[in-house]
């Protein structure tokens, strides 16, 4: 499944193309580029799901976790490093289908809904970045990689909520959402650092976690801090105050934020 890298690469390339060259494109061209990229991503996601769930199961009846890509990015010690890659397990494969489907529908709907809007190309660039961030989050091979894409989701939300940047209400809503979720994400980051320090790994693998020496009593604290990040993205009390104002963005962005940022990331 080496082609799975395209699931992340295509929306990223779409973001670069529209972000850097969008002002020289017509609205129709920009919309077609963004929608075509997501159409291919959706097809690849469904293909991945079909191949993954049709493969023979392990002896205990579970599906094998696959890692088509993985490389060391930041090595700290011989046993502790931050890797980057793609992890395919039942949850991540299922979420690839959900994210690509919802995002593709939003891309298609936006083609008509945003017709004639100023900043049409910029909108599709942000939408591509948002989609890439969510896809990268669910296929992360470790907690730290997940955090990087988690923050990209937050940045993308900020850009889309504040799309109508000439409206003071939209700017205020974008800032509010960004700042409130940053408080939650700070807990997430501290939890990741505590977890890595005491567990000696950032991996999701139960086997490597079981081999980690010492610090077992600190793991629940680390996981509790990580939960704060999820609480912020999910708009749980008392970190829910940003959600009503998030409707200042385009209508379909609010739909994508509610369906994806809150449900998927949270």
Put a short name on every predicted segment.
Residues 1-266:
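...captures the hydrophobic TM-helix bundle architecture rather than a specific catalytic motif
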């Amino acid at each position: 499944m080496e082609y799975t890298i395209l699931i992340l690469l295509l929306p990223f390339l779409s973001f670069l193309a529209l972000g850097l060259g969008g002002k020289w494109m017509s609205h129709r061209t920009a919309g077609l580029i963004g929608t075509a990229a997501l159409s291919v991503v959706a097809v690849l996601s469904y293909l991945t799901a079909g191949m993954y769930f049709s493969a023979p199961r392990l002896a205990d009846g579970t599906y094998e976790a696959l890692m088509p890509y993985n490389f060391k990015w930041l090595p700290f010690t011989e046993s502790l490093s931050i890797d980057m890659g793609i992890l395919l397990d039942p949850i991540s494969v299922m979420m690839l289908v959900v994210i690509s489907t919802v995002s593709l529908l939003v891309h298609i709907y936006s083609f008509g809904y945003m017709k004639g809007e100023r900043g049409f190309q910029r909108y599709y660039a942000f939408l591509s970045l948002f989609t890439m961030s969510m896809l990268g989050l669910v296929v992360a091979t470790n907690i730290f990689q997940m955090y990087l894409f988690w923050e990209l989701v937050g940045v993308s939300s900020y850009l889309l909520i504040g799309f109508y940047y000439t409206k003071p209400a939209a700017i205020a809503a974008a800032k509010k959402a960004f700042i409130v979720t940053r408080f939650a994400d700070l807990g997430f980051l501290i939890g990741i650092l505590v977890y890595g320090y005491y567990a000696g790994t950032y991996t999701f693998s139960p086997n490597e976690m079981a081999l980690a020496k010492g610090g077992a009593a600190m793991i629940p604290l680390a996981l509790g801090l990580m939960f704060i990040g999820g609480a912020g993205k999910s708009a749980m009390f008392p970190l829910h105050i940003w959600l009503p104002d998030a409707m200042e963005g385009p209508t379909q962005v609010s739909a994508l934020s509610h369906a994806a940022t809150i449900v998927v990331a949270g």
